Amino acid sequence: MSRANVLSLYRRVLRIARSWKAQSSIPKDTDTEKKYITQEARTLFRQNQQITDPESIQRCMEECEARIEIGLHYRNPYPRPTYLPPMGLATQKGRKLRAQQRLRKQAKPVYLQSQDET
């Protein structure tokens, strides 16, 4: 991915933030959500600006696109939570914690890849 594509995506997020209207139509909520979108974009783009691997850049851009689409569809800028119980994924016999951690990482949706594991 080229620098121009990344900057174009960043500008798109900022344009969405500028024209965002909260689902509740309350001006305070709209301002809060606009600030969240802008701050989240700034934080994640700056956090990832040192990435040079094309595959990693592509994954970050896919995550951004997914979050944009989900946010626009549901009119909610916040990432959707995932509900996976700590040891809720099935494993084969003999494999315990490492397998669970790997399965949890694989089960994480693309739009939450940048979120810390809680």
From Swiss-Prot:
Bias type Basic residues, positions: 93-107
Domain of life: Eukaryota
Region annotated Disordered, chain positions: 91-118
InterPro entries registered for this protein in UniProt: Complex1_LYR_dom, Complex1_LYR_LYRM1, LYRM1
Family: Belongs to the complex I LYR family.
The protein's name: LYR motif containing protein 1
Species of provenance: Danio rerio
Taxon lineage: Eukaryota, Metazoa, Chordata, Craniata, Vertebrata
